[in-house]
């Protein structure tokens, strides 16, 4: 069996490689995907992939496994960056990680290697089960690190080629393995950036592509101007972090993109504005549910799932009814559907209702 393993330079993908070697697989080649555009790097002033490559090289030497760097800069820009920029301009909150997985890691990369491999292995926290050639995507054992949310827009064809060996391990167990086998990157911190952005903060990415534009911050209930901000594209509905005003905490409740205004409420009023019904569209079903009840939804990456029912309307729009209110439902983000621990697929949030 020919196996391709995606290495990021981090601990997770390195332990995934070790796990496959321990299982006896020998025909293995590793790949590092380079996506950074040089003008972005010159603006931000740091080259995040050089350190990655150092670790990839040392890990592959340790296990005597070949590796190759694949350049996907053009594909990354055309398939992910342009999507994120357009969503931000429309006042939406994009989810670049979802499309990095669908369009880059398991899209453009699959195209580059021309399906020469029997299996593609990564360090994602998720599980893939195959029963009678019927594939399901499931949550990882580590519910805090679980990445099924970001994998929800993969196709069955993509999933059929994937293997996630870390799905049955906790992060603490992976760190322990890394120390036991003395991985060169055993003490490397996890990446906190979006997608492949590594060390680069999301706001720096947005600032580079959209710049800054002063606008007013207005209290929702009184219409009073409380301060200024640097552009509506830096904010999302429900956001608390970054609103540097006294008498808080404050939360973003609305965005006026025509006039570049951010509306906010304090915690008391904000808690009255939760939503339990909203519309989604552009649905990707990995496995479409047979019944529309007894489902759960994730509105954002994290542990929390909310029980829900769904109803298909005209034009393939779905109405989602949550069993409890959520306070940060934002158009452009994604709602991911689950049946117990199985990730069924996901859809783009169109608008909130009640």
Swiss-Prot record:
One of the GO BP terms on file: tRNA modification
Keywords: ATP-binding, Cytoplasm, Disulfide bond, Nucleotide-binding, RNA-binding, Transferase, tRNA processing, tRNA-binding
Localization: Cytoplasm
Pfam families in alphabetical order: tRNA_Me_trans (PF03054), tRNA_Me_trans_C (PF20258), tRNA_Me_trans_M (PF20259)
Segments of this protein annotated with the region Interaction with tRNA: 145-147
Cellular component, GO annotation: cytoplasm
Residue positions of the active site: 100 (nucleophile), 195 (cysteine persulfide intermediate)
Molecular-function annotations in GO: ATP binding; tRNA binding; tRNA-uridine 2-sulfurtransferase activity
Superkingdom of origin organism: Bacteria
Function: Catalyzes the 2-thiolation of uridine at the wobble position (U34) of tRNA, leading to the formation of s(2)U34.
Protein name according to UniProt: tRNA-specific 2-thiouridylase MnmA
Organism field: Borrelia recurrentis (strain A1)
């Amino acid at each position: 069996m020919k196996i391709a393993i995606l290495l990021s330079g981090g601990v997770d993908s390195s332990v995934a490689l070790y796990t496959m070697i321990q299982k006896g697989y020998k025909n293995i080649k590793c790949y590092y995907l380079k996506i950074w555009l040089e003008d972005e790097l010159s603006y931000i002033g740091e080259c995040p992939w050089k350190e990655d490559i150092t670790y990839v090289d040392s890990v592959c030497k340790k296990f005597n496994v070949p590796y190759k760097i694949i350049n996907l800069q053009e594909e990354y820009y055309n398939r992910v960056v342009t999507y994120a920029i357009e969503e931000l301009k429309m006042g939406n909150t994009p989810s670049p990680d979802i499309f990095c997985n669908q369009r880059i890691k398991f899209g453009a990369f699959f195209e580059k290697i021309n399906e020469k491999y029997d299996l593609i292995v990564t360090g994602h926290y998720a599980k893939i089960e195959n029963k009678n050639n019927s594939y399901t995507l499931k949550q990882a054992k580590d519910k805090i690190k679980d990445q099924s949310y970001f994998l929800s827009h993969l196709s069955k064809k993509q999933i059929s080629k994937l293997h996630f060996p870390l799905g049955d391990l906790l992060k603490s167990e992976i760190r322990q393995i890394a120390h036991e086998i003395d991985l060169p990157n055993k003490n490397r911190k996890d990446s906190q950036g979006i997608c492949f952005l590594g060390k680069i903060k999301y706001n720096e990415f947005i600032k580079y592509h959209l710049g800054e534009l002063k606008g007013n911050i207005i209290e929702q209930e009184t219409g009073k101007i409380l301060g200024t901000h640097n552009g509506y594209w830096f904010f999302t509905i429900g956001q608390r972090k970054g609103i540097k005003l006294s008498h808080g905490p404050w939360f973003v409740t609305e965005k006026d993109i025509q006039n570049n205004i951010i509306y906010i409420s304090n915690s008391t009023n904000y808690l009255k504005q939760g939503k339990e019904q909203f519309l989604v569209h552009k649905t990707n079903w990995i496995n479409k549910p047979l019944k529309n009840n007894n489902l759960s939804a994730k509105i954002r990456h994290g542990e929390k799932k909310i029980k829900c029912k769904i109803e298909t309307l005209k034009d393939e729009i779905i109405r989602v009814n949550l069993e409890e209110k959520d306070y940060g439902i934002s158009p452009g983000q994604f709602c991911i559907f689950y049946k117990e621990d199985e990730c069924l697929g996901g859809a783009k949030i169109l608008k909130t209702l009640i």
